[in-house]
Every structure is written in C-alpha cells, then in structure tokens.
C-alpha cells in the first residue's frame, strides 16, 4: 500500500473517512520490537486480600508441598558426577524409596506399562514384582523370602569375594542377566526389549521387606545393609558451601 | 492447544509431578496421540521413567489411552488434553468449596482425591480418618462412619463420581471415543459397604485399643476390597456449575440488593437437579413455588416478591426472564446470557484498567452499538476528535477493536468504502483468555526465579527450622533456642521476609487470575455448546 503511493503523494485510502487530516503527520514508524517491560500508564489494581484469599493461598502452598512427597512425584535418576565415589553406592538408594509405595490397580492400566522392578545383584533372592493383582503370590513370597534370607546370607558371603569389582557399579545389566538365568522363578513375563534397556532400580532388601511383611524395620543401617548410619558416608563435599556473607565470623 | 496453554501446562506438571512427567506430558500435548515406543524415542528418557510418568498421568486423568488407530493389533495410543491439566490451578478453590459445604471432613476427602487422582472409597476414608485423628486431641479418634457419611453426601450431590470403567485395558477397544463417567448408570451410586473402624494415630498411645482396631481393620479391609475396583474421582463439572451459580448470585447482589440475590439463589437451588449442565436457562419456576421455597429468614410478603421478580426481569443484565403467566408468573434464570454479561463486564473492566475510563467508554459504546464510523464514535462518546482517534487506534493495535469494511462499489475503492469500527465479544474473550494463561505462566516463572535466586537462603532457614523443631521436641533450654535462632542474621531475616512476601503475592495473583480464567472459559464453552 505504501509502496504504490511512493511515486505520488496520495495514499491508497481516503484520508477523510479514517480521520487523518492533511496537516497532521502520521506517528513515527516502529523500527524495532516493542520493549520487553514497557512503561505502564495505569498502575494495576492491588490484589484482593481478605480471609478467603489467604486461606486459598495456604491451601495452594500446602497442596504443592504435599505433592512433592507423594509417590507420583517422579525424580529423574541423579546425574553421575565426574568421578565415582565410594559413598555413591550408599547414597543412591535414598531417593527411590517413594516409588515402591504406590501399588496401582493393574486392571486400569494397559499391560505394557507394567514395570518389573529388579533387586540389586547382591542378593540371591528372586526378583521382586510390582504386580499387585496376585495377593496369594504375595503370601507365598513372604514365606519363601524368609527362607531365602537364610540362604542369601550364605551366598552373600561367597559372592562378596567374587563380586568385589562389580559391586560399585549398580547399572551393570550383565550381572542382572546372569542373575535372571539363575532364577528359579518361571512365571515371569519379560519384554525382550525392555530387558536390555531397563535401568536398575536399586530397591534394597530392607525396603522390600518392610513393604511386603509389614515389619517395623528401622531406617539407616538395615536399609543400606551397612553397620554405619548414613552420615558416615558423607564425603565432605557439602562442607563450606554456606554463605560467606558474614565475614566477621572467621572460618577455621 | 495453543502455545500458551502448553507452556502453562508444562509449568504446572513440573511443580506438581516433577520434571520427568513434565517432559512426557508436554511432548504428548504437542504431538497428539502417540504410542509408547514413539514417546520413548522422542523424549529420550529411559523406558521405566516414561512408563511411570504415563501411569501417573493416567492415574490423574490427564492422559487417556486407547487402542491404536490402525486396528485391534496396533499398540495402545496415549493422548493428553490441556483442559484437565489446567484444572490444577483451581484445586484450592475446589477444596475450599468442599470445606464451606461439608466441613473439614469434606475438605480432606476432596483434597485426598485431588492428590491421588483416583482412589477407592475405603482407601480415602482410612486416610482421611487418620489425618483427622492426627489433628485431634489425645485419646480421641475419628470414626470411619463420619467420614463415610461425608463421602456419601459428596457423591449424592454429584461432587464426586465413579471413574469410568476402561473396557479391557489390555485388549482392543472398539469405540474411538473414551466413555465419559456419565455414560455409566451407576456413576453416582455409593456401594453398600460398611466400614467399621476408627482413624489411627501415627504414634499410638494406647496399644490395646490399637491392636483391637488393627485386627478389625484387617478383617474389614478384606470385606471392602472385595468390591472390585470402584474408583472415585472429583467431578469438576459439578464444581464449575457451583462456581457459576455463585458468580451469578454475587453479581445480582452487587447490582441490585441482598434480597434479590436471595431470590435468585432460591431459584438456582430449586433447579439444581432439573437443569442439565449445558442448559441455556433453568426450567421455568412459578412465583408460587419460589415464594414457598424462600428461606425462612426472608419472610417477605407475596406482593413484594412479585415486585422483586419484575425488577429482576426488567434489569438490563437479563439474569432472570419471564417465561409465562401461569402460576403467578413463570420465571427462568438465563444462564448463558448471564455468563455472556459477566464476560462482557470482565472485558470492559480490562479495557478500563489498561487504557483509562474514556477508552472504556468508547469500548462500551462499540459493544452496544455494534458498528460505528469514526465520526459517530466521536459524537456519541463526547470525546474530542483527536483524542478519540488516538484511543481508537490504540485499541485497534491491541486487537480489542476491529475494522469492518463495507464497500459501496464492487471494487473495494478506498474512497468509496465505509470503514466501521466494531467489537466482537467472543473472539475478544478468547484472546483475553489466552492472555490470562500467559499471565499465569509468567507469574509461575517469576516465582520459580525468585525462589531459585534465594535458594541457599531458603535452605539455610529450613535447616535452622528443623534444628529448632528437634531441639524443642527434645526439651532444650531457651538459651540454646535463641543461639540457634541467631544463626540467621538480621539482614538475612529481612531478605527472607521480603522473599516470602513476594512469593505469597505471586501465588495469590495466580489464584485471582484463575477466577477470570474460569469466567471467560465458561463463557466460551457456553457459546460452543449453544451454537454447536
């Protein structure tokens, strides 16, 4: 429209009807994007306060906080740091406890979404299943696991000599395959593809027992199969990260 | 699924379900229906994480699955919709409504169901009883029957509904459209089940009673879970109807007076069960019925009621209409028209707050007179020409006002064409709705930014609070407590207070914008159903 009117002074639309008078000039053209935070001529109104608004606010913040602690809040697997540290073996299981608390009703979900959780290779026990349908299988397992705890204790002693190198690497799928073959339990269904790609969930023996049998095991040493509490494995990398703003307190 | 909606859904998923679910959810929103393999491949996450995220999304109703489009053998496809995820913004309002209607028990029932997505009745009752028992004094515990009765009341008034049974989750589903909850006749029937027991406190003081209760619970849990898989979910539509009614009543109270709003409230209450959710107006009610159903505290004589009704009918907002003369006059509440008027008032106030009252006058004028020329606008609005032109162009550049060309000749020659200014209410409402979504997304991002900036300070204060709590529990002296409190310096405390104030303001602003979103959404949906 403007290009065609370039050679002549008239514009393509009638100036009268749109309202531009002859003497006035058009406002300057914009050469760049509008500013990100433009100045507002009118300030916005203040928020409505009041009891209801505050109660709604409290409800909202409580809800957000509560959702973080539920099993549906999924944390990604923690990124591995540059160098493997000894304490990783004991720290990595802390985050995954919430995942096993939720036993969904598998009839309402498509079958392909079922996850078969694997136990770490250290135990000689059969693979745990997140299949909630079979309550009877659960009971059989309870009995079986108690017997197998004793067997496990013996095999653990043997295995610790053999697997001293492989212990530190939890994501070792070859170990898992070996264990799968040794396993006497024949009812399990495997997806060929998921067998290769799955990443181990390090669910320890202690946490599973507390889910299946309901015995009140204490946290800490039993959960991680060590004799020390978890702060023993703090590797000192978090020290000194606090604020250095207060320079009048000397740091020794 | 506009870009703003997807962005807001992503932020909501991130806050409530973590970043893994956010990735999977936004991918589904952007790409439509997909099967599991494609999702895994395109998001680049591990198989287990994707499976868990999909389960979480399905559990909360944000994702639906059905057998593939290519036939019974193809893999199941998952699709997600923005609407359900955007409801998360409104959760506090739902919980608060349940509290006002059914007390603390109702509030906790609705909160539990919102947190978990779908739950069985027995599971909900147990959890809520335990939570209530936690807050009660020592020695008292909450009885299951009280919680069950609150649950049943919620189901009877349709605030809760059964989840639709998914026909053969593993097998082929022939119907393309997933069944709605309403298509099942038992949707609102509570199964006949007796739950006997009391809530358990976490730290049990009386072991004997708890053991007895535990035994009885185990027996009853076997009884109740024999009812195969009836899951309950919150019925958002019913809550929305409630909010809509509340909006109409408060609008009448603001425009007229308290008594008229009570009359409208009575009319709406009487038509709660007889009106379908998509109805344009309620069923006609005779003035005699209204008179009989007015609450006892409002004993106004019959002729005064007639005068009020006439006033309501004559009001330009057209909340109430007259549908006939029998029974002393038949009156209806015009629901869709009321929603349209409320949306119009919202648009007008937006223009007023952003551009000033004179621009608002022009806007209202154009809404009423539909099409006006430049000169007519100046005359009717009584604003000098130059300023009127300026304001019109500002409104035009913000797309709140449109230009309509009416040619006099078949070649649209500019000198022989009328240019009329006009406002179309529905497209403008849609545009403002998208602006609202963008606003909420910006508020959330700003809040996350503020918390991230002061993350170290927040963590430090949390640690100190934990230390204080543990010291108090173990009974420490006041000097130790003050020593620990002094670990936070005064400037840090100021910073923390300012941060808390900002975060509260941003959160509160989100709640308020959501009220506008609700109004505009209801209006847009009501036009869709009436024209479609």
What are the residue ranges of the model-derived segments?
Chain B
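N-terminal alpha-helical scaffolding segments that mark the starts
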Residues: 1-44, 56
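Hydrophobic residues on short alpha-helical segments
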Residues: 21-28, 106-111, 260-267, 348, ...
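Short acidic, hydrophobic short linear motifs in intrinsically disordered regions
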Residues: 24-25, 30-45, 116-141, 166, ...
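Intrinsically disordered, low-complexity regions enriched in proline, serine, glycine
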Residues: 36-38, 51-52, 65-67, 75, ...
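Residues in the recognition helix of alpha-helical DNA-binding motifs
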Residues: 53, 150, 263, 308, ...
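A short, conserved structural fragment
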Residues: 58-69, 148, 152-168, 301-302, ...
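Short, amphipathic alpha-helical interaction segments positioned at domain boundaries
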Residues: 76-111, 168-254, 335-364, 412-456
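Long low-complexity, intrinsically disordered regions
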Residues: 398, 442-532
């Amino acid at each position: 429209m403007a290009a065609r009117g370039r050679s002549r002074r008239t514009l393509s639309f009638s100036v009268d009807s749109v309202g531009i008078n002859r003497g006035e000039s058009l406002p300057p053209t914009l050469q760049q994007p509008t500013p990100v935070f433009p100045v507002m001529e009118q300030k916005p109104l203040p928020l409505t306060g009041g009891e209801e608004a505050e109660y709604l606010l409290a409800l909202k913040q409580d809800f957000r906080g509560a959702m973080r602690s539920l099993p549906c809040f999924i944390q990604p697997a923690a990124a591995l740091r540059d160098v493997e540290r000894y304490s990783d073996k004991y720290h990595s299981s802390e985050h995954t406890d919430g995942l096993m608390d939720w036993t969904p009703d598998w009839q309402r979900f498509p079958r392909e979404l079922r996850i078969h959780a694997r136990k770490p290779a250290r135990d000689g026990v059969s693979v745990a299943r997140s299949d909630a349908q079979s309550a009877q299988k659960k009971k059989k397992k309870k009995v079986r696991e108690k017997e197998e705890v004793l067997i496990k204790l013996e095999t653990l002693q043997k295995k610790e000599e053999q697997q001293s190198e492989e212990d530190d690497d939890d994501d070792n799928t070859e170990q898992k395959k070996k264990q799968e073959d040794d396993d006497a339990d024949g009812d399990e269904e495997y997806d060929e593809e998921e067998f290769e790609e799955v990443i181990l969930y390090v669910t320890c023996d202690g946490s599973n027992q507390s889910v299946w049998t309901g015995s009140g095991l204490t946290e800490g040493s039993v959960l991680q199969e060590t004799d020390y509490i978890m702060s023993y494995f703090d590797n000192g990398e978090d020290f000194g990260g606090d604020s250095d703003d207060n320079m009048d307190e000397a740091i020794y | 699924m506009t870009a703003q909606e997807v962005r807001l859904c992503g932020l909501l998923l991130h806050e409530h379900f973590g970043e893994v679910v956010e990735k999977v959810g936004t991918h589904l929103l952007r790409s439509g229906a997909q099967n599991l393999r494609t999702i895994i491949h395109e998001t680049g996450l591990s198989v287990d994480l994707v499976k868990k995220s999909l389960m979480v999304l399905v559990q909360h109703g944000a994702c639906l699955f059905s057998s593939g489009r290519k036939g019974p053998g193809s893999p199941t496809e998952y699709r997600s919709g923005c609407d359900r995820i955007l409801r998360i913004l409104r959760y506090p309002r739902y919980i608060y409504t349940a509290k006002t209607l059914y007390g603390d028990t109702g509030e906790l029932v609705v909160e539990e169901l919102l947190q978990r997505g779908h739950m069985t009745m027995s599971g909900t009752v147990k959890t809520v009883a335990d939570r209530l028992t936690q807050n009660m004094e020592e020695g008292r515990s909450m009885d299951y029957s009280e919680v069950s009765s609150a649950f049943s009341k919620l189901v009877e008034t349709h605030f809760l509904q059964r989840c639709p049974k998914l026909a053969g989750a593993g097998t082929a589903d022939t119907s393309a459209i997933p069944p709605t909850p309403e298509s099942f006749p038992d949707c609102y029937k509570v199964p006949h089940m007796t739950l006997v027991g009391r809530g358990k406190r976490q730290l049990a003081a009386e072991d004997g009673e708890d053991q007895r209760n535990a035994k009885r619970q185990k027996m009853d849990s076997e009884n109740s879970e024999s009812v195969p898989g009836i899951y309950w979910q919150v019925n958002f539509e019913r809550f929305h109807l409630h909010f809509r009614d509340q909006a109409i009543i408060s609008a009448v109270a603001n425009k007229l007076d308290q008594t008229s709003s009570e009359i409208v409230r009575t009319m709406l209450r009487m038509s709660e069960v007889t009106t379908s959710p998509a109805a344009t107006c309620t069923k006609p009610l005779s003035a005699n019925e209204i008179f009989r159903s007015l609450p006892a505290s409002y004993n106004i004589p019959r002729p005064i009621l007639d005068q009020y009704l006439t006033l309501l009918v004559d009001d330009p907002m057209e909340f109430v209409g007259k549908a006939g003369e029998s029974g002393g006059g038949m009156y209806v509440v015009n629901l869709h028209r009321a929603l349209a008027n409320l949306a119009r008032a919202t648009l007008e106030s937006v223009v007023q707050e952003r551009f000033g009252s004179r621009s608002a006058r022009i806007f209202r004028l154009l809404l009423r007179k539909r099409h006006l020329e430049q000169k007519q606008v100046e005359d009717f609005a009584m604003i000098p020409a130059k300023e009127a032109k300026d304001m019109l162009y500002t409104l035009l550049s913000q797309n709140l006002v449109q230009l309509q060309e009416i040619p006099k000749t078949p070649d649209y020659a500019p000198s022989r064409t009328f240019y009329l200014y006009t406002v179309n209410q529905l497209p403008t409402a849609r545009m403002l709705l998208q602006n609202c979504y963008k606003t909420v997304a910006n508020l959330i991002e700003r809040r996350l930014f503020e918390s991230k900036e002061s993350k170290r300070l927040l963590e430090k204060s949390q640690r100190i609070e934990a230390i204080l709590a543990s010291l108090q529990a173990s009974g420490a002296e006041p000097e130790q407590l003050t020593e620990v409190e002094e670990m936070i310096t005064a400037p840090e405390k100021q910073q923390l207070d300012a941060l808390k104030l900002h975060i509260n303001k941003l959160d509160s602003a989100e709640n308020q914008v959501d009220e506008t979103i609700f109004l505009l959404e209801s209006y847009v949906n009501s036009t869709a159903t009436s024209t479609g």
